Amino acid sequence: MINVFRAMLVAALLACPFVCVPLAANDDAVTPMQGIPPTRESQVTMANYRDYPMSMWAFRNASAVLNTVMIPREGDIRPLPGPLRPEIGERRFTDPQGRELSFDALFQANYADGVLVMQGSRLLHEAYFHEFNERSHHIWFSMTKSLASTVFGLLVAEGKVDLDASPVKYIPELKGSGFERVTIQQVLDHASAINFKENYTDLQSDFALYYAPALNMGWLPGAADVQPADAEVYGVQDFLVQFIQPDPALNPGEAFDYNSSNADLLGWLIARISGEPLQDYIQRNVWAKLGPEHDAYIAVDRALVPVATGGMNTTLRDAARFGMMIRDRGEFGGQQVIPAQWIDASLEVSDKVAANMAANPKYGEEPWTAYHNMWWILDADKGEYCAVGIHGQVIYINRSADTVMAWFSSQPGASAARNPEFRAKLQAARELAVSLTRKL
């Protein structure tokens, strides 16, 4: 059966390569989902939903493309009072391409779908582009990792987790896997020294043949259709048990190697230790306490288990509410949602963690100074850090400026920091935060 599956998947890949090919942003681009029924050239599918311009429709309608489960809101809506400051959208910035643009024009030119600026409890600015609006949901992708780490902190504070223990202590099924020799803290820092690599070009890799179909988020076209019910690997947790092995060239804690399977494991730990499905744990402990305007939802893998590595979907305002809670050390609306000690821990960067980032050649020209507890650190002393997702999703937090900015994007390139469109938006946000600091 596995050989049949391999043949079917490789045939599908050869027929429709899964590597995203960026398209230029121009008026000639196909408008997604045009016509009743949609024309074939404008049809969004699991095979093309991450390709621009199809992504402009798909990222705000992810529940139409992916399997999802609901994370319901409850209680009163926490208002985001103004007044709005129109001059923020008109402020001029120079992007990395040398173009002088207004704040809003810069974000729109760099494939943003929406951007929002908060200082304190005040909503200073929000702008939406294309067909996106304040009621639209948008997929977070890997910003979800930071959310998972945040709720994990509750279990740590309750004494239910030992960060220096192996994950095997809580998930015995992982005994003999690459995760047996690591600590949970090393998993949180992507320093687990496992041999699994997210290889998007080797069609015979474990990633292509097993992980991507199990994840069921369209990383490989046709994956939802070609995976047989009796496959060796059905869901992501099956993959973690069967395929993750230690990297013989590395010891845990020696290197920063960003790897989505670490967040998959974190989601499993949360569910196993709490005794609740991940979506229920998030809803009860975080989402219900943020006064969101809308329900959230999260993509699930083939086994219908929430994708902790990249499945969250919310509106932009509700993403900002989460960012405000993080900025304010876990407090929101007069209640302590997450222990302040855990929120602060993400900014307590050891010399070793910082050195691991500096030593990784992938990030040599990037602004990040560290990656810790599944957050991207810019300046720990200023409390400046981010949740980041592929295709340009960001929650930017700056404690010293009392500022949170959030933006969603459909930028063609998947990689975030190594993308000029991503850099342009992050640079403008950081410059704006500095100017807002001067007015405090």
Could you describe each region identified by the protein language model?
Residues L106-L116, F129-K160, D164-G178, V182, ...:
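Short active-site loop at a secondary-structure junction
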Residues E293-A296, L347-V404:
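Active-site Gly/Thr loop motif
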Residues N26-S42, E384-L440:
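Structured C-terminal helix/loop/strand segments within mature extracytoplasmic catalytic/sensor domains
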Residues S121, I139-L163, V187, L266-I270, ...:
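Active-site SXXK
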Residues Y128, E134-R135, N199-D202, L209-A303:
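Catalytic-site signature segments of enzymes, centered on catalytic residues
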